[in-house]
Amino acid sequence: MKERFIKKTHYLDYQFDEPTDIKLGFTTRENGLSPYPNHSFNMARYISDSAHHITHHQDILANLIGYPRDEWVFPIQTHDSRIVEVTSEHKGTNIDELTDDLHGIDGMYTFDSHILLTMCYADCVPVYFYSEPHGYIGLAHAGWRGTYGQIVKEMLKKVDFDYEDLKIVIGPATSNSYEINDDIKNKFEELTIDSTLYIETRGKNQHGIDLKKANALLLEEAGVPSKNIYVTEYATSENLDLFFSYRVEKGQTGRMLAFIGRK
């Protein structure tokens, strides 16, 4: 399948089949001010970095994609499966500074226009949802905990229209080189999707898991047509020149920003 994320300055831009009012993308680590290492484009305020750096990077991205910072919404993610609907009243939340608002949220959606849903990632899976006929957009953060917690199915529970009208984009995340132990493997085997399709045993207490594939399987099992699910080939852990990787860089790294908005 042709890669739909096209590299631009500072971000990957998702290419739709038809003209659309939706903007969907994922930032890269290139050409910024942050020390991860020097000149990195970190987008997270919650790690050790200058607030000035983050604001500067936000301003750059805002100008590139046509969504001013006061239209952005950023929840505080906690690797859980809590979902919230956001509206125009949430615009600007946690953008200039972090607050207690939208804390513990790993999935959000809206039917309002002129809102940019944003979340930070550095190996976890960004899952974008949209339906042009229904004016709906959504974004979920699925690390191994969120994937095991089936956050994508929690997102689907909030959808009250036919899944034929729903499109899903699974963005850049770690490759199947992401290693888990027996305990985590056993957790995933509790799920009703076939674990042999996304987990590969490589040695004693060593298993590689394809989190992008697992989320696609969960969506298909829930009834989303496979033709409506796009999975990028980009892997954060395999492209350190382009992406931050929490696992590969042992936590000493920045964060990319996934975003989706509708004019």
UniProtKB/Swiss-Prot annotation:
> Keyword Oxidoreductase, does the record have it?
yes
- Binding locations of Zn(2+): 79, 124, 141
- Which Pfam families does the protein's record reference? Cu-oxidase_4 (PF02578)
**Which SUPFAM superfamilies does the entry mention?**
CNF1/YfiH-like putative cysteine hydrolases
Provide the E.C. number(s) assigned to this enzyme: 2.4.2.1, 3.5.4.4, 2.4.2.28
Keywords associated with the record = Copper, Hydrolase, Metal-binding, Oxidoreductase, Transferase, Zinc
What this protein is reported to do is described as: Purine nucleoside enzyme that catalyzes the phosphorolysis of adenosine and inosine nucleosides, yielding D-ribose 1-phosphate and the respective free bases, adenine and hypoxanthine. Also catalyzes the phosphorolysis of S-methyl-5'-thioadenosine into adenine and S-methyl-5-thio-alpha-D-ribose 1-phosphate. Also has adenosine deaminase activity.
What protein name is recorded for this chain?
Purine nucleoside phosphorylase SE_0862
Q: Which organism is it from?
A: Staphylococcus epidermidis (strain ATCC 12228 / FDA PCI 1200)
